[in-house]
Every structure is written in C-alpha cells, then in structure tokens.
C-alpha cells in the first residue's frame, strides 16, 4: 500500500508548541504525528498511539476516557518531549456510523464488546502497521509507550519498548462500566479496577 507523507509544519497549541507531519494511507486514512520541535530520535522517545475518537476528542463525550488521555499525553509530551501518533481509527476502527450504532446498543444494555460483536466486529479492529512505518520514517528505534493497552505493547515490531508509561484517567459515572470491561475483558492495565 502506498503511503504519502506531508511536509513538517509548526503547530502552536493550548498544550504547547509542537510540529506535525501527516501520513496518507491508501485512499482514505490520514494519520497525524504531533511531536516536540527538539525531538531527539537517537534517544528513547516518549510515544503515545492515540486512535481517533470524534465523540470524545472533539465533543467531550463522558462515555470514554479518550479526550482526557489525549490531553494528558499532549501535556506529557510538551513537558518531557516525544510524539503523539494520532490514528484515524474511529471506534476501535469500526468507523463513526458503526460506533454510533454500538452506542445505541450500549444504551440498551450491551457492553462495548458485546455491541461490537452484535454489529459483526471483533472487540478491537485496530492494526498498528502504520505506526511501525511512522516510527521507521522518523528513525526512532527505542520508545517509552504511553498506554494501558497490552495490544499496543504487543503490536509494535520495529522498535524496542523500553518501558510502559501508564496514562490513567479516573473514571466517571458514564464511563466506569466501559473502563471496567476494558480492564476485565481486554486486559487493559487500569489500577482503579484492581483495588
């Protein structure tokens, strides 16, 4: 599959001054890297892989912790250096329309995994080959991965993962069950639900 790369541009944001570079995968998926202007790829780089969540990232949905994780990651990268890789994989890669349908099923009592299965999808449809491509493109060989997701830890093949940096957000009344399912059924490393 052909991947087209953009130039690098500056991006001042409310979280700090960053640079950005975009990658177009095939005809449709455009991913974004947000990184420190002084990124040193000869050292271990702090990396967050964040999958798009329009309802959380843009609208502030309380049904997930996506926006809070993204904002915490950008603050961390601003302070410590590194990169956020923003993947266009809405709804764990089932797309926005199917995600809304999954939300409707959840409104009727199914959990996030049951809803995906009801729609004919796996619990998590995401893949991370593009992340390997991006890390290679930057020349990054060693990372600290900001994640709670064991699938992300297991999926990266082109780099050495020095350590996992947890990025936990306290649950609320709307996402507590969702996060508990991620912990109990998907193996997410969430300390709140181990106490």
From Swiss-Prot:
Full protein name: GTP cyclohydrolase-2
Coiled coil: none
Pathway: Cofactor biosynthesis; riboflavin biosynthesis; 5-amino-6-(D-ribitylamino)uracil from GTP: step 1/4
UniProt-annotated binding residues for GTP: 48-52, 69, 90-92, 112, 147, 152
Keywords annotated in UniProt: GTP-binding, Hydrolase, Metal-binding, Nucleotide-binding, Riboflavin biosynthesis, Zinc
A single cellular component GO annotation: cytosol
Binding-site residues for Zn(2+), renumbered to this chain: 53, 64, 66
Entry's Gene Ontology molecular function annotations: GTP binding; GTP cyclohydrolase II activity; zinc ion binding
Recorded catalytic activity of this chain's protein: GTP + 4 H2O = 2,5-diamino-6-hydroxy-4-(5-phosphoribosylamino)-pyrimidine + formate + 2 phosphate + 3 H(+)
InterPro entries: GTP_cyclohydro_II (IPR032677), RibA (IPR000926), RibA-like_sf (IPR036144)
GO BP annotation list: riboflavin biosynthetic process
Function per UniProt: Catalyzes the conversion of GTP to 2,5-diamino-6-ribosylamino-4(3H)-pyrimidinone 5'-phosphate (DARP), formate and pyrophosphate.
Active-site residue list: 124, 126
Encoding gene (name): ribA
Annotated organism of origin: Campylobacter fetus subsp. fetus (strain 82-40)
CDD domains noted in UniProt: GTP_cyclohydro2
